Swiss-Prot record:
Na(+) binds at G77, T80. This is Fluoride-specific ion channel FluC. GO terms for cellular component: plasma membrane. It is a multi-pass membrane protein. It catalyses: fluoride(in) = fluoride(out). It comes from Bacteroides fragilis (strain ATCC 25285 / DSM 2151 / CCUG 4856 / JCM 11019 / LMG 10263 / NCTC 9343 / Onslow / VPI 2553 / EN-2). Keywords: Cell inner membrane, Cell membrane, Ion channel, Ion transport, Membrane, Metal-binding, Sodium, Transmembrane, Transmembrane helix, Transport. One of its GO terms (biological process) is cellular detoxification of fluoride. Na(+) is not transported, but it plays an essential structural role and its presence is essential for fluoride channel function. Belongs to the fluoride channel Fluc/FEX (TC 1.A.43) family. It is found in: Cell inner membrane. Pfam families: CRCB (PF02537). HAMAP family: FluC. The keyword Transmembrane helix applies.
Length: 127
């Protein structure tokens, strides 16, 4: 039960942070640029970097299981959003933005994987 509480708190914090980040990114980029889900893209790439970092860092410093759950399953799980990526992609398709759709899906997956690798590398650099 203790693990569920850590995940619950981390997830809530991650969700609120995602919401605020998406608003900030969308206010700065979306009106001026072509129809691209910048906020969702940003949180998913940042979240991928963070989860790579948290996993690597927690292994390196032997963080408690509960703290690992809080950071990865909770915070990163709440911060990132695959469902919104899928919904944004569908909106691009329905809007006839086929090129942007293809680019968005491809670059989200590619940069997400690269961000996890980069985060893992950064986590290993701490001494």
């Amino acid at each position: 039960m203790k693990e569920i509480i850590y995940i619950f708190i981390g997830g809530g914090m991650g969700s609120v942070t995602r919401y605020l980040t998406q608003i900030a990114v969308n206010e700065r980029l979306s009106p001026a640029l072509f129809p691209f889900p910048w906020g969702t893209f940003a949180v998913n790439i940042i979240g991928s970097l963070l989860i790579g970092f948290f996993y690597s860092f927690s292994e390196r410093f032997n963080l408690s299981f509960e703290l690992r759950l809080f950071l990865t399953v909770g915070f990163c799980g709440g911060f990132t959003t695959f469902s919104t990526l899928a919904n944004d992609s569908l909106s691009l398709l329905k809007g006839g933005f086929y090129g942007i759709f293809t680019f968005y899906v491809f670059i989200s997956i590619l940069l997400g994987l690269l961000a996890v690798l980069a985060g893992g590398y950064l986590g290993e650099q701490f001494k």
